[in-house]
Every structure is written in C-alpha cells, then in structure tokens.
C-alpha cells in the first residue's frame, strides 16, 4: 500500500490587483512516499554546498525578487541556485498541479476563494479514482 503526500503552497495575496502580483496561485505537489528521494535531496544539498550555499533552504520568490539575503547576490549567482532547483525537480518522480486566479478579474476575497475552490474541487473529482488506485 502506498502513501501519497500532498504538499500545498500558495503564492500571492488576496489583496487588490497589482501588476507586480497579478495572480493568486495554489500549488500542490504529489509524492508517493514509497519512492525514496533521500539520495536526490542529498545530491541537491551537495551541489548547493559546492557553490557556496551549505544547509541552504531555497525559496524561489526572494531569489527572483532580490529580497533579504539575495539582495546583494548578482543575477548569475541567483540563476545558478534556481538552475540547481529546476534540475532537482525535473528528475524527481513527483507530479504537481497549479491553480490560479488572475486578480484583475476579481471583485473581492470571496470571489477569489470561490474560484480557487471550484478549480481544486473539480481537479479532485476528476483525479479521485487515480488517488484511490495509488493507495491500493
């Protein structure tokens, strides 16, 4: 029997439309826990260490926006970090799904929540049997 882990993260905010943050996004990453990714994680940590980032937790938003500790890091160095993360993600046996709402077409938080809820519930209904089959 498999165990499916679902990691959920959001990006953006429910606030008014802003060209710097035009979307509200909810992402789900699906990982079958019977597939061990420890070696992949160790490899990523080693690669980050080799470019000067030992024990480094990657948060893409601050890297892209040059925030916090990434403020003084030049474009090429930030790109190297992101490329390591992209390569790591591509090789993993995971799947993901993104749900988003373009905020310029939204009246209020209730509409944002409603549109996202509809997308997520439709996805779950469509994939429900797949989720059950994985658990058998």
Region spans (language model):
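Phosphate-ester processing/binding pockets and catalytic centers
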Residues: 1-136
């Amino acid at each position: 029997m498999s165990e499916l882990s679902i990691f959920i993260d959001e990006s953006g905010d429910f606030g008014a439309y802003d060209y710097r943050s035009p979307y509200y996004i909810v992402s789900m990453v699906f990982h079958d826990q019977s597939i061990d990714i420890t070696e992949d994680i160790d490899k990523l940590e080693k690669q980050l260490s080799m470019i000067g980032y030992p024990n480094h937790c990657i948060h893409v938003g601050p890297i892209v926006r040059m925030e916090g500790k990434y403020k003084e890091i030049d474009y090429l160095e930030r790109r190297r970090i992101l490329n390591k993360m992209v390569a790591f993600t591509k090789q993993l046996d995971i799947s993901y799904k993104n749900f988003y709402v373009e905020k310029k077409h939204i009246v209020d938080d209730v509409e944002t929540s409603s549109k996202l809820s509809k997308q997520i519930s439709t996805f779950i209904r469509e994939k429900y049997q797949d989720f059950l089959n994985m658990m058998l």
